[in-house]
Amino acid sequence: MKVSVNWLRDYLPIELPANELAEKISRTTVEIEGQYQPQANMKNIVIAKVLSVVPHPDSDHMVITQVDAGEDEPIQIVTGAPNVAEGQTVILAKHNSIVGGGQKIKKGKLRGEVSNGMLTALQELGFDDKVAPKDFEEGIWVFNDVDAADLTPGEDALHVLGMDDDVLETGITPNRADLFSMNGTAWEVAAILSEEPTLPTFELTETSEKTADLISATAPAELAPKYALRVVKNVEVKDSPLWLQRRLWTMGIRPISNVVDVTNLMLLTYGQPLHAFDLDTLPSKNIAVRTAKPAEKIKTLDGVEREASEGDIVIAAGDEALMFAGVMGGELTEVTAKTTNIVLEGAIFEPKAIRHAARDQNLHSEASTRFERGVNVEDTFTALDHAAALIAEIAGGDVTEGRVVAQDFDYEAPVVKVTTAHVNHVLGTEITDAEISAIFDRLFFDYELNDGEFTVTVPARRWDITIEADLVEEIARLYGYDNLPATLPTGETTPGKLTPKQALIRATRHDLEGLGLNQAISYVLTTPEKANNFQLHDGQPIQLDYPMSQDRQQTRGSLLTGLLDDVAYNVARKQADVALYEQGRVFVSNGDANQLPAEIEHVAGVITGNVLPRTWAEGAQKADFFALKGIVERLLANYALADDVRFVPTTARAEMHPGRTADIYVGETLIGFIGQVHPLTAKAYKVNETYAFELNLDAIFDLPKVKDGYEVVSRFPAVARDLAILVDRDVPAADLRGAIVAAGGELLHDVELFDVYTGENVADDKKSLAYALTFVDVEKTLVDEDINAAVENITAALADQFNAEIR
């Protein structure tokens, strides 16, 4: 926010130079992001009165003027300004003057006629186009007759325009929205300087005509906890007096008209946005605060017709929506030069709805910013009354009797306690009760002190203070951060290390990268259609109240949705061979709004295209189920899980291929799944044949692990035997391997499947599998009797469990 130091001086006796004041504010309150004087380096610019205007003899668009600039003789100026006229009071940049941007103005000739300077527009003095009044966009600045009567030719124009003011640009933090007003800033500077601010006062004179006879209003408390209207009749809408325009443009706001400018002045003074309606153009005299109807449209003050969204708060008259509440007014009831009767609105609106409407309509205004961050609830009606009084004063209006109040509430000031002992414990100081009392006095906080405990009643203007820590902060910053004693950290130092879960996550990433997968990081938020895909957990995704886009509305329930988007991105750019993994959290809610959602650590991976490229020796190896299964098995082996890993075929996962998908169990615990992405799902994500897995790392972390140890390497030779069996075609190889391991006894060291055969000499409903069995004894050399006994146990178990035939 821009802060005028001259305006602050109306509140406080500030003797400090602006740069020292800025330093104190930065050290105590908020950062001063910039400091400047609008007149920067400009000089020799004065008030002048146009004495005569004659056409230029050699130009159809320029004129020759004689102006009184307070010197002995008139000064001749040649100008092309279309709005120059005799009798006007204007701004003159004299010979050897410097205007905005460092441009020097010198005496010269224009089409043969001498010009001793330049009549200037505000933009030529450095005014932004967004601040300069619209009436003078195409010409020079002309003072109105009322203001001109108080000006003297030759007077310093930069001073008259308020350009010798010092302006501070404050970086207001979210918790200090009270500084979005000059009153709030004055209270803060008063505390810094140990002064008492003198806030603006006003006198309101009302007519006998009652406001309630002219207008009515309704407002639900959940949309507008405060809402009131006032009526001012018989106003004359015209340019504001110079003092008011000067205040506005110094603060970066364009003057529009006396009525609108007063509402903007109240916004700057109190931090309370107000709005003015043309009473005579209201479709109905019944004003209502409500939410927008489906497809309801409003033509706003910028001339754009906008469609309101569900949940937007609108102000309606009868059945017609007039404006987006707290964001921007409507063209239908705009105050214009023809307006004679106005309705003033003062309100507090629900902040979330204002934020949603401002973002949805891309209408971030000074008003919406303040409603979003909060306003002083005790100033709403004060600002409304002050605006009515000032409009009556400068626009000649009559204020009708009373406010029409649709909604109000009694504010209960929060009471917060803090002890001197606690303050000193937190800050490491030895501050006394008297010093803390002095700080609360500087802040103008009411308090009671009882045996070292302060009971503080927080004023409404400081709604950021709600807990003990807030009071400690107030004490610290006004005591002076530089005055806090410097102390070294106490306590024993400990070596930094990863927690067990962090170590597991880091090892997972390392292993997957070693197995050929590249890490991807995708968005946590996704579409409602994708949020439920590939879910490993029962629960619901979480819907954002105000999503930033249609593609980022809900939290993900699986990492695979983002990974498939990443695959699609790569495939669309001619990168067909993709192997990616992501480690991150998924979010699961049980539907209870009073409980936080579960955040569960997962890891997922996808492969598509070729996992190995073509070489001179052999062709490319295409991605398939078994390539990915090998990656997952290696990863799980590195976790040293105490129980066996099982891959159980499943058809229950709708997004996965029903014949090429398996759930992954460790013991009886489901930890994930693996398989081919269903062709229809792949088509929806715009990817080719893709294989994927997802694991629950939190579940894996909680599983029992094998303790670190070592296995003796036998110095005796191993013995290998091959075993070929014939079984039904639907018997899983993993089940056969499990039976072999269980029946093989302690001597069986390793089992490897090395051949699967179907075809000639094998029945259509059968398949032949060949296993390589390795036997080892660490204590002696194996003999045939030992091995034969183990093989007989294995063949008997296979025949018994699977009706297997030994080939």
Residue spans of the language-model regions?
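Phosphate-backbone binding interfaces of nucleic-acid-interacting proteins
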Residues: M1-E203, N376-V377, A383
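A carboxyl-terminal module marker
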Residues: K2, R27, R442-F445, L612, ...
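Glycine/proline-enriched, intrinsically flexible loops and inter-domain linkers
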Residues: V5, P55, V63, T198-E296, ...
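Beta-rich nucleic-acid/ligand-interaction surfaces
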Residues: A40-K43, E206, T493, L498, ...
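Conserved mixed alpha/beta core segments that line enzyme active sites in large multi-domain catalysts
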Residues: I47-V78, S257, M266-E334
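Class II aminoacyl-tRNA synthetase-like tRNA-binding/catalytic domains
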Residues: E71, G108, A288-M328, L332-V335, ...
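Mobile "lid/hinge" segments at catalytic clefts and subdomain interfaces of large enzymes
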Residues: S115-D128, D135, I315-Y411, N570, ...
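Extended, well-folded interaction surfaces typified by the phenylalanyl-tRNA synthetase beta subunit core
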Residues: V416, T420, N424-A576, T774-V776, ...
